[in-house]
Structures are given as C-alpha cells and as structure tokens.
Amino acid sequence: MKKVYICSPYRAKDGAELDRNIDYAQQLTRQALEAGLAPITPHLYMTQCMDDKKPEERARGMAAGLALLKGCDFVIAGVKYGITEGMDREIHTAN
C-alpha cells in the first residue's frame, strides 16, 4: 500500500472556514483510503493536541508533519480553497 501525504488548507479566518477546511481534509483522506492508499493527514490530528494559533506549537507540528512527508510515496495537494503558507512549504519539501 502506497503512503500519500494529504496537503490542504487548515488555518482559517473564522470557525465556519475552519470547519470547511477540516471537512475538505477529511474528504481527501477518505478518497485516498477508498483508492487503496495509506493517507497521512497531519493537520487532522496534530491540531487535536497542539494549538495551531501558538507559533511555537504550530512550528513543532509543521516540523513533525514535514518529517512524515519525507516517508510518503507522493503528495495529494487539495487546492480547492487555495494554497496556504503551510501548504506551500509542504509542496516545496515534496519536490
């Protein structure tokens, strides 16, 4: 089973946008599973134990996510809602 890193927006200007971004990440993760892939979607679970609004915790979570990215076979970039700063970093790391 190939490992795929799911890259999509997380940060949001309000609660509705955050919910939309989480739903989108979940949809991409489900699609990857249904395609027989092993998805890695760090922003769905890192944010459960780290506060993305605290710069030091965000940096720690991003570093951990980038370490996971390096072990993946490829990346799915969900760009439906644009490319965020974090996504840009992930995409450049993958290349």
Positions of predicted regions on the chain:
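Catalytic phosphate/metal-binding cores of nucleic-acid and nucleotide-processing enzymes, i.e., regions
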Residues: M1-N95
